[in-house]
Amino acid sequence: CSTKQQFDETTVTDYLDYPLRVYPVGRLDKESQGLLLLTNEGDLVNKIMRAGNYHEKEYFVTVNKPVDREFVRRMSKGVPVLDTVTRPCRVVQTGECSFRIILTQGLNRQIRRMCRYLGYEVQKLKRIRIMNLTLDGIREGEYREITAQEWEELNHLLESSTSETVIRTGEQNGNSSDHANERAGAKAGQGSKGVLPAGYRDHKQQRVRSDVR
């Protein structure tokens, strides 16, 4: 989804009855679902999404055929996509045709492209974690406020992060959703449930939302 009205489609913010304009942290393509953090702080968006900060985003993925050790090994090591090679990442098989993957970068449609390169097609992709924020306790289509403890921990994790935009090889020409967000300062996202940090409603509005289709 997006915060822009494109092709007369409903945007994620249309579902929120909220007085301030908020933006999703990161993107999920239209076919994906899962956790989404909404905020009105562009600097927070940039710190979380900037690839150089190496912050984790975790996904649950189902593919069209059985996963084997070679698939897990090659996905973990890095796969050529978009004129670059993806960073080494953690991949754990969870079922015959499913796995969890933890990324620290956000190339355009990265997981789908990685799987396709290895001869697989993604059937379901769900983001289940952004840094310390998870979907735990949030049902399909719901959102909640970030707790004070989550907000404190998030800020601690971001202490040494920079919000500066740095374009790297293979992350130019719109290939990286991380940098698309950095250039926009909090541009767009797709997903479903949301959270706001308790006690920060006046100035720092954060929601964690998750789109489940």
Where are the model-predicted features located?
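Basic, flexible Lys/Arg- and Gly-enriched helix-loop patches that mediate nucleic-acid binding at interfaces
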Residues: C1-R168
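Phosphate/adenylate-binding "loop-and-lid" substructures adjacent to NTP/NAD/dNTP-binding pockets
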Residues: E171-R213
